[in-house]
Amino acid sequence: RHNLSLNRSVAERADMEIILAFKAYALWKTFPIFREYISSTTASSLSEAKLAYHEFGSKAHTFSPAYTDYEIDEIAQCSSHLTFNSLTQYERYHERVRRANSDIRLGLRVNPEYSEVGTLLYNPCAPGTRFGVSADKLPQTLPSDIEGFHCHCHCESGADVFERTLAHIEEKFSPWFPQLKWINFGGGHLMTRKDYDVEHLINIIKGFHQRYPHLKIIMEPGSAFGWQTGPLVTQVVDVVEDKGIRTAIINASFTCHMPDCLEMPYMPAVRNAETLEVDDPTKAPEGAHIYRIGGNSCLSGDFMGFWKFDHELQIGENVIFEDMLHYTTVKTNTFNGITHPSIGIVHLDGKLETLRDFSYEDYRSRSEEHTSELQSPIHLVCRLLLEK
């Protein structure tokens, strides 16, 4: 609730709308709490748009790199705003979208060709990006039903980064601002991090309002809502050693349950342990009680390390990874059929409620046949191959 309160306060003081990005957090059983503080969400797929409409109770602000013939109508019906990634996608679908939802607000994603995100995997403005329209490719007069621009350039960034990025956005795209009604500055604004300068962000937005008073401002953070609110509690199931490297194997998996750790990569904080930076991951640092932590999948690279503990790890004791709520539950996979950790919530009175337990049926149902009138070409190809 602290994160929700801060996001609502920033939105009110800066006179903008802050909405939740489902790509980072989509635990719908907690939506009643969220609805006390925010009124909208952002989606990037049909499933997320339906979750917004049916579970959050409001239509989504939707963006996708590429909409499809077999989903676009239902996406439009579940969306209040729909942003196209390219002018070709706009030309292909804008009339169809309006037929499906006459009240929808349309936008274009633009590429300011500037981002300070250092990891290429997460940099939406890197050379060759598939995201957005650059200024040199925009027509001088926008299509009459385009009401807004969407820019996404950040990843767990500070207000100072947004200030510098905004200068590039204005330099490249302000000539089109008089034709717009709203602008969405995307996600990656980590307002709830301790060192985030909230006052500076508010002043930046107020200055933008003074320059462009007709534009409604939207931000759609994800991590800022779930930041430091959910640890992953695992247990040590074995300790093995090879070539001087001790590995504590846990009953969870980096590749299945914490994929961002391997993708970025980054070392998650472990409670009551010191994270050790090493130049050569094949050699253990010197000292006592130093461990790699290994996952319980068959992937050779399902490990990270090293961490230094203040004692010998014992089979059965907890290893707790901090800040594991965002970009985990939405990205878990069933590689190896590894069971997912249960999901729970601690209420204000201290009571722990289990929101979700996972079982064999969750794994099995991924390959279970479902009859549906709407089938994607992927489904049809798979069925044809099986029938042959």
State the predicted function of each range:
Residues 16-182, 196, 204-207, 211:
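Active-site-proximal beta-alpha core segment in soluble small-molecule metabolic enzymes
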Residues 204, 219-368, 372:
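Charged (often Lys/Glu-rich) extended helix/loop segments that serve as interaction or gating elements
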Residues 114-116, 155, 191, 225, ...:
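Feature marks short, surface-exposed loop/turn motifs that line or immediately flank catalytic pockets
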